[in-house]
Amino acid sequence: MSKTLTHLQQLEAESIHIIREVVAEFANPVMLYSIGKDSAVMLHLARKAFYPAPPPFPLLHVDTTWKFREMIQFRDRMAAECGLDLIVHVNEEGVKNGISPFTHGSALYTDVMKTEGLKQALDKYKFDAAFGGARRDEEKSRAKERIFSFRSANHRWDPKNQRPELWNLYNTRIKPGESIRVFPLSNWTELDVWQYIHLENIPIVPLYYAAVRPVVERDGMLIMVDDDRLELKPGETVQHKSVRFRTLGCYPLTGAVESTADTLPQIIQEMLLTRTSERQGRLIDHDQAGSMEKKKQEGYF
């Protein structure tokens, strides 16, 4: 008698199939590890896909040098515990030129330290496929992107020239220099991710849990004072509030939400009641209309 899979089991099976398909079809895949909750789920699925062997590809983190300190500590611990090779790439030219979110703005900073940094790493190590944790429910440009997303030799994405995806059949053919970005969590929602983390007891960065943290209110967002590089503007004062993060990125560009949810069941309950996107807290999404789609066309994940 066949067993009916639950909703989460169906999502898990689809994601594991996608991960295995990439390993079977590509010569040199890599998993982008941004240290957030989606990366945590994706890494967990990859470990399941090849258990008891480790995943047959490295992790890649594009370090902008502005991530939360707790994220970097968590990244190093997880890589060591999983026994995986961790490649950390920094755009040294950007560092040399002093590119920062404060002095150059979020758009230029993201382009130099994230997009260009990612393209440098993919070219340097000659990866032909890269896993990412993006989901279709996050943002409108991601909603229309394929699971196997073709990139030109310049890493560009053309939303008007996407390959058909019928059922679970994926076109993996590329020419030398071209690559594919692969999104195993495309069909997951934010709530699915949290419920799966709870079900599988997946470790996540403590910043997702509510705690009293030092923040400043800036441009309608609560920005955490993570180190002494955050300079206060006139009239700003540091406040200590109970906050958590729904999404994690570079700390000067990521807004916290006031919350007392310090357990997974409480976070899930919040998700059931919220009516705003998790990416409302990401300043880079507010640069201009169609901001994310423009970034993706230029090579952003």
UniProtKB/Swiss-Prot annotation:
InterPro entries named among the record's database cross-references: PAPS_reduct_dom, Rossmann-like_a/b/a_fold, SO4_adenylTrfase_ssu, Sulfate_adenylyltrnsfr_sub2
CDD domains: Sulfate_adenylyltransferase_2
Protein's UniProt keywords contain Nucleotide-binding: yes
Pfam families listed in its UniProt record: PAPS_reduct (PF01507)
Keyword flag ATP-binding: yes
Enzyme Commission no: 2.7.7.4
Superkingdom of the source species: Bacteria
Catalytic activity as recorded in UniProt: sulfate + ATP + H(+) = adenosine 5'-phosphosulfate + diphosphate
Enzyme class of the recorded protein, top EC level: transferase
Family classification: Belongs to the PAPS reductase family. CysD subfamily.
SUBUNIT field: Heterodimer composed of CysD, the smaller subunit, and CysN.
This protein's name: Sulfate adenylyltransferase subunit 2
Gene field: cysD
